[in-house]
């Protein structure tokens, strides 16, 4: 879900709870007393304030989950093995078949592709089977008390108060991920207020147990974000021998006709007239030795749901597979996986020492790190894809004498 941490089923490696962290300073009781006043001042009714806060205690494992930073980065090919596994594809086709009338009606009303809705449903909650069972109020209250994202978490709790006061949901329905996302489509409370839908007209936006409400809510989000009905999301492409990676920019959008002039070809079939008229970016999620993808405006719409390239590729590919499409053609460079956080910090330090500014070493391979790596690669006559993998790490460390 937009603005939420990718959590339910996909991803954060949780640290051991043998040494549970506790925020320093303010006690939970003191935070709760102060927030009770802020919640009331926001217009929440006394009854709802009591239902949310009376007897509420923190859940310490949520703090551990929030603070944990996985050491190892999952390669995109490993992610896709789960996101678009044979089981998930089969379950997606079954879920679509069971709910075809609802899915198609929702897709038609909001003008989105039905298989995309089903794919998001599959990644967010395994088609409604695993929506999360954490108490959302407890989760958000714990995150607010912990303090790292207090303003955000308190804002989401105020949104919960509005949900309850408006009768959109009941207190016992408010379950989801430890990060505050709810229901079959994993909406955070503020997004729920903005985008959730009452498909069956019963007066509630039941994204927890009502498939129509859940699907319509996701469809409304995609529609409002600009989904282009009939437009593609991604297209796997082959790059020509001698492709000029040094001139490529990750966010460079140009007509597909221009990409074709640069020698790119579809991995399967031929260019369609529709493709050639659209603008697209070239994504290389595993670097220049892995599959390439042209990504279109609908790809950016998917990222409004979850701002992760792997997630967006996973949704688009799962949707295509549910619709009967084939697996990706190009092989993944499994001998050149992403490096871990410690190695990334070492890489950043080495790049800085060599005069390629990657910013303050933090172990996160962001845009500055990739740009610095590309500059290093160009200076050494290497394939300048900026992919922070094992081979690039070895080259930089050797150059730095590490």
Segments predicted by a language model, with ranges:
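N-terminal secretory signal peptides
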Residues: 28-50, 54
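Positively charged n-region of N-terminal signal peptides that target proteins for export
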Residues: 1-4
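Bacterial N-terminal signal peptides
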Residues: 7-17
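Boundary at the C-terminal end of the N-terminal hydrophobic targeting segment
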Residues: 19-23
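Intrinsically disordered, serine/threonine/proline
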Residues: 25, 32, 63-64
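Short acidic, glycine/serine/threonine-rich helix-capping segments at coil-helix boundaries
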Residues: 339-344, 352-395
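Intrinsically disordered, low-complexity Ser/Thr-rich linker and spacer segments
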Residues: 396-402
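Catalytic glycan-binding domains that act on GlcNAc-containing polysaccharides
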Residues: 44-278, 287-293, 299-314, 318-341, ...
């Amino acid at each position: 879900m937009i603005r939420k941490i990718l959590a339910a089923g996909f991803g954060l490696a949780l640290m051991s709870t043998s040494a549970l962290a506790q925020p320093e300073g303010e006690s939970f009781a003191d935070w709760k007393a102060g927030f009770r006043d802020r919640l009331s001042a926001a217009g929440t009714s006394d009854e709802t304030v009591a239902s949310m806060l009376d007897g509420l205690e923190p859940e310490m494992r949520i703090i551990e989950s929030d603070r944990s930073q996985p050491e190892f980065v999952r390669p995109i090919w490993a992610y896709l093995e789960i996101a678009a596994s044979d089981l998930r594809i089969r379950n997606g086709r079954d879920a679509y078949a069971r709910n075809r009338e609802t899915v198609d009606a929702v897709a038609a009303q909001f003008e989105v592709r039905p298989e995309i809705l089903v794919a998001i449903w599959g990644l967010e909650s395994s088609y409604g089977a695993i929506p999360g069972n954490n108490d959302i109020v407890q989760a958000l209250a714990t995150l607010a008390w912990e303090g790292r994202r207090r303003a955000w978490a308190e804002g989401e709790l105020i949104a919960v108060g509005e949900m309850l006061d408006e009768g959109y949901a009941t207190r016992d329905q408010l379950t989801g991920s430890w990060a505050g996302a709810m229901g079959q489509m994993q909406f955070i409370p503020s997004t729920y207020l903005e985008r959730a839908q009452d498909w069956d007209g019963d007066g509630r936006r039941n994204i927890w147990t009502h498939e129509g409400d859940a699907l319509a809510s996701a469809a409304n989000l995609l529609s409002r974000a600009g989904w282009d009905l009939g437009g593609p999301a991604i297209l796997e492409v082959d790059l020509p021998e001698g492709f000029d990676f040094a001139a490529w920019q990750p966010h460079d959008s140009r007509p597909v006709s221009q990409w074709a002039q640069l020698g790119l070809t579809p991995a399967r079939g031929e260019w369609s007239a529709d493709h050639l008229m659209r603008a697209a970016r070239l994504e290389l999620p595993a670097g220049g030795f892995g599959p390439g993808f042209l990504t279109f405006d609908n790809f950016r719409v998917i990222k409004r749901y979850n701002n992760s390239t792997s997630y967006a590729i996973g949704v688009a590919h799962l949707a295509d597979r549910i619709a009967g499409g084939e697996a990706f053609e190009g092989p993944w460079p499994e001998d050149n996986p992403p490096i871990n956080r410690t190695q990334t910090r070492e890489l950043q330090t080495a790049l800085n020492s060599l005069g390629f500014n990657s910013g303050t070493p933090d172990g996160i391979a962001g845009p500055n790190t990739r740009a610095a790596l590309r500059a290093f690669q160009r200076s050494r006559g290497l394939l300048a894809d900026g992919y922070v993998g094992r081979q690039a790490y070895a080259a930089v460390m050797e150059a730095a004498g590490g």
